[in-house]
Curated annotation (Swiss-Prot):
The gene is Nedd4. It catalyses: S-ubiquitinyl-[E2 ubiquitin-conjugating enzyme]-L-cysteine + [acceptor protein]-L-lysine = [E2 ubiquitin-conjugating enzyme]-L-cysteine + N(6)-ubiquitinyl-[acceptor protein]-L-lysine. It comes from Mus musculus (Mouse). WW domains are involved in recognizing PPxY motifs in substrate proteins. The WW domains mediate interaction with LITAF, RNF11, WBP1, WBP2, PMEPAI, NDFIP1 and PRRG2. Undergoes 'Lys-29'-linked auto-ubiquitination at Lys-847 and serves as a scaffold for recruiting USP13 to form an NEDD4-USP13 deubiquitination complex. Activated by NDFIP1- and NDFIP2-binding. Disruption phenotype: Lethal during late gestation. Embryos show a retarded development and defects in vasculogenesis and angiogenesis. This is E3 ubiquitin-protein ligase NEDD4. GO terms for molecular function: beta-2 adrenergic receptor binding; ionotropic glutamate receptor binding; phosphoserine residue binding; phosphothreonine residue binding; potassium channel inhibitor activity; proline-rich region binding; protein domain specific binding; RNA polymerase binding. InterPro entries: C2_dom, C2_domain_sf, E3_ub_ligase_SMURF1, E3_ubiq-protein_ligase, HECT_dom, Hect_E3_ubiquitin_ligase, WW_dom, WW_dom_sf. It is found in: Cytoplasm; Nucleus; Cell membrane. Residues 217-549 are annotated as: Mediates interaction with TNIK.
Length: 887
């Protein structure tokens, strides 16, 4: 033990409880109390009675609880000496510098609650603070416990939690000066108080009872062990030797434990590319079949994402650019149960073709998650018809059923050899000459903004078995006599035919997209196709070598022709789409160290600033990823990866603002926002940033001589600008430059600037289907709103009346990304872990709605009509950038 440590932890002279009481009574007389009176009568918790330091008789905390139970059991009470010595290896929580830790010591009774509490002094800028403060408590050993909570003092926001230790008092030893080795300190492992807490390190404590009635022999042989479950270490000689907590069970194969940029521990399943907060156990290890099911689920979710033009053009007027191949279905395609004995239509809806081709590809490849037996007919050439597959009837997810534009899900329009149109219901495997009746309502062809004021009479008749009634308070509700239930929502609002073609989007992303497609130049001096022969097990390495081996990037604009080793199949677009899904899964996997999850959730990505430490050729890989992204945009395909908003802004060479930081790192945002709105001079901040790398803290100057420049009211805007530049731009400048170099080899930089950052995400990742019912089911309400509130009814009515793009825009507005978690809105994440979508009543009707992307919260004023809510919500979504209400 070092000399300074020994000096800090020198043993105090032993005082009996009677001596302590005598001293307190003397102090009572000096302080004006009545001689001989009970000390507890003059004490008011949580304050201490009098102050005493048994080492030097200088003032120090001596606390006696005012628990009435003590008076009845005075013979059972003891005085415990608690010494808070030090903290070791605490977590760093202060983003503007080292932590400022202090300890709150609370004596409590599990039955009656807190008895008294005291706080140590704050040690500035230290992760290994030394307090050396003593406290005396009068306690009932069998009833009372002491809770030690460590916090990081923060002037900008609330104090950060660094860990806690809860110690029972009955097993503590009694001080005995005759012992050759006096009782020494113990290091307690700091524990979290919830799964969201990020803690590490130890709290060094010394806890002993004073001898009772002057008896030095009492409990001399008492064991010094605490109750089972606490990890401690008795270390009289080696202060640097730390205890090790019990080894947790090993992770299942393919799993890895990591910490995000906020220090939160999460677990990565590299086989399924999934993450979770809960530590998996070997018993939770997924079978191959389970992994295949999740893989197929991810593929299905990826397949349903589309470009804006894929679901709005009819089959008759659809253009056939090079990136979309029109495929004729073979006449002999059969469905078990009832075959459709008629030729296919001359044009197949693109979304329908992609779904069929993707399913066919999975079946041909023998995907273990696909259990249908497949029989394939021979084909003579690559340009021939699609191979015929006969599938045994299996449950099929509706999302993959072929669907023609303008028809209900699962319905497809076809033509026979005479050119007559008929309709296939893939849900029931039946055909009919009649167009589905739910589409016959002519109102479905009128945009919602041209229908005039929304009225129940405009929605047509109620479905069979439904009745509309008026409640005593004037609100309208609906009765479903079929199942004998009532609800507030109008069932007609869920009729896609009535609410389908909603308000055309004023930003007109569709027109931008079509203009963009027309301006992309088709190369005439390149081969007809670009072939890639790949191995599934080495798809990243094979793709990297093939694409980076091309010196002239224009060759990548040729039609993609992809073959997987050992598989026979035709690539009419489906295999290329599958390749983009698989290569995205590999490129963006944090396992390779090129990307990492953002601070907000575990499904949006950002470039890893330390990627060079993981891969020496990281810049070459970023150029490769840029080329792949450019190929996806050029060929009209999609990437399975969603990035933070500043990433898209950097691609567009737009300035990143403080607002962009909120959805990425809420702690940084809150701190910088406070600095912007207040005078930071008293904080003694400098133009430096502390960065932790592999457990060591490094200082980075934001400008030359920054360590000597104090942040004041005059230069705080410059400080905030430099922090944002460092956080998003400077640290990844080389990686981003390599990515853009590869991307702009295929896509003209000036042409991409017609989009904003939200539209660029849709261009690269596509539009997904938002399940409004799932969204609504996993929504919380605050500050007066509830599921049955009239404004909430109007809000969900508005969401149901939106088209797919507008719903995605609303999702981007409130969460910062167009990505819905694979398992739905139940797994939506915010800055502090799982965070459900929340609608909170706020403001007055003259205000626009505002969003808090780090909390997935929408502040919605109490509007007085549906039309007012509709107009204000549209305005807020479309004018996010210049809208002060969004923070």
């Amino acid at each position: 033990m070092s000399s300074d440590m020994a000096a800090d932890e020198s043993e105090a002279p032993v005082l009996s409880e009677d001596e302590v009481w005598e001293f307190c009574l003397d102090k009572t007389e000096d302080g004006g109390g009545s001689p001989g009176s009970d000390v507890t009568d003059t004490c008011e918790p949580p304050c201490g009675c009098w102050e005493l330091n048994p080492n030097s008789l200088e003032e120090e905390h001596v606390l006696f609880t005012a628990d009435p139970y003590l008076e009845l059991h005075n013979d059972d009470t003891r005085v415990v000496r608690v010494k808070v010595i030090a903290g070791i290896g605490l977590a760093k929580k202060d983003i503007l510098g080292a932590s400022d830790p202090y300890v709150r010591v609370t004596l409590y009774d599990p039955m009656s609650g807190i008895l008294t509490s005291v706080q140590t002094k704050t040690i500035k800028k230290s992760l290994n603070p030394k307090w050396n403060e003593e406290i005396l408590f009068r306690v009932l050993p069998q009833r009372h416990r002491i809770l030690f909570e460590v916090f990081d003092e923060n002037r900008l926001t609330r104090d950060d939690f660094l860990g806690q230790v809860d110690v029972p008092l009955y097993p503590l030893p009694t001080e005995n000066p005759r012992m050759e080795r006096p009782y020494t300190f113990k290091d307690f492992v700091l524990h979290p108080r919830s799964h969201k807490s990020r803690v590490k390190g130890y709290l060094r404590l010394k806890m002993t009872y004073l001898p009772k009635n002057g008896s030095e022999d009492e409990n001399a042989d008492q064991a010094e062990e605490l109750e089972p479950g606490w990890v401690v270490l008795d270390q009289p000689d080696a202060a640097t030797h730390l205890p090790h907590p019990p080894e947790p069970s090993p992770l299942p194969p393919g799993w890895e434990e990591r910490q995000d940029v906020l220090g939160r521990t999460y677990y990565v399943n590299h086989e399924s590319r999934r993450t979770q907060w809960k530590r998996p156990s070997p018993d939770d290890d997924l079978t191959d079949e389970d992994n295949d099911d999740m893989q197929l689920q991810a593929q299905r979710a990826f397949t349903t994402r589309r470009q804006i033009s894929e679901d709005v053009d009819g089959p008759d007027n659809r253009e056939s650019p090079e990136n979309w191949e029109i495929v004729r279905e073979d006449e002999n395609t059969e469905y078990s149960g009832q075959a459709v004995q008629s030729p296919p239509s001359g044009h197949i809806d693109v979304q329908t073709h992609l779904a069929e081709e993707f399913n066919t590809r999975l079946a041909v490849c023998g995907n273990p998650a696909t259990s249908q037996p497949v029989t394939s007919s021979n084909h003579s050439s690559r340009g021939g018809s699609l191979q015929t597959c006969i599938f045994e009837e299996q449950p099929t997810l509706p999302v993959l059923l072929p669907t023609s534009s303008g028809l209900p899900p699962g319905w497809e329009e076809k033509q026979d050899d005479r050119g007559r149109s008929y309709y296939v219901d893939h849900n029931s495997k039946t055909t009919t000459w009649s167009k589905p009746t739910m589409q016959d309502d002519p109102r479905s062809k009128i945009p919602a903004h041209l229908r005039g004021k929304t009225d129940s009479n405009d929605l047509g008749p109620l479905p069979p078995g439904w009745e509309e009634r008026t409640h005593t308070d004037g609100r309208v509700f609906f009765i479903n006599h079929n199942i004998k239930k009532t609800q507030w929502e109008d069932p007609r609002l869920q009729n896609v035919a009535i609410t389908g073609p909603a308000v055309p989007y004023s930003r007109d992303y569709k027109r931008k997209y079509e203009f963009f497609r027309r301006k992309l130049k088709k190369q005439t001096d390149i081969p007809n196709k670009f072939e890639m022969k790949l191995r599934r097990a080495n798809i990243l390495e094979d793709s990297y070598r093939r694409i980076m081996g091309v010196k002239r990037a224009d060759l990548l604009k040729a039609r993609l022709w992809i073959e997987f080793d050992g598989e026979k199949g035709l690539d009419y677009g489906g295999v290329a789409r599958e390749w983009f899904f698989l290569i995205s899964k590999e490129m963006f996997n944090p396992y390779y160290g090129l990307f990492e999850y953002s601070a907000t959730d575990n499904y949006t990505l950002q470039i890893n600033p330390n990627s060079g430490l993981c891969n020496e050729d990281h810049l070459s890989y970023f150029k490769f990823i840029g080329r792949v992204a450019g190929m996806a945009v050029y060929h009209g395909k999609l990437l399975d990866g969603f990035f933070i908003r500043p990433f898209y802004k950097m691609m567009l060479q737009k300035l990143i603002t403080l607002h962009d930081m909120e959805s990425v790192d809420s702690e940084y945002y809150s701190s910088l926002r406070w600095i912007l709105e207040n005078d930071p001079t008293e904080l003694d901040l400098r133009f430096i940033i502390d960065e932790e790398l592999f457990g060591q803290t490094h200082q980075h100057e934001l400008k030359t001589g920054g360590s000597e420049i104090v942040v004041t009211n005059k230069n705080k805007k410059e400080y905030i600008y430099l922090v944002i530049q460092w956080r998003f731009v400077n640290r990844i400048q080389k990686q981003m430059a390599a990515f853009k170099e590869g991307f702009f080899e295929l896509i003209p930089q000036d042409l991409i600037k017609i989009f904003d950052e939200n539209e660029l995400e849709l261009l690269m990742c596509g539009l997904g289907d938002v399940d409004v019912n799932d969204w609504r089911e996993h929504t919380k309400y605050k500050n007066g709103y509830s599921m049955n509130h009239q404004v909430i009814h109007w809000f969900w009515k508005a969401v149901w009346m939106m088209d797919s793009e507008k719903r995605i825009r609303l999702l981007q507005f409130v969460t910062g990304t167009s990505r819905v978690p694979m398992n739905g809105f139940a797994e939506l994440y915010g800055s502090n872990g799982p965070q459900s979508f929340t609608v909170e009543q706020w403001g007055t009707p003259d205000k626009l709605p505002r969003a808090h992307t780090c909390f997935n919260r929408l502040d919605l004023p109490p509007y007085e009509s549906f039309d007012e809510l509709w107009d204000k919500l549209q305005m807020a979504i479309e004018n996010t950038q210049g809208f002060d209400g969004v923070d």
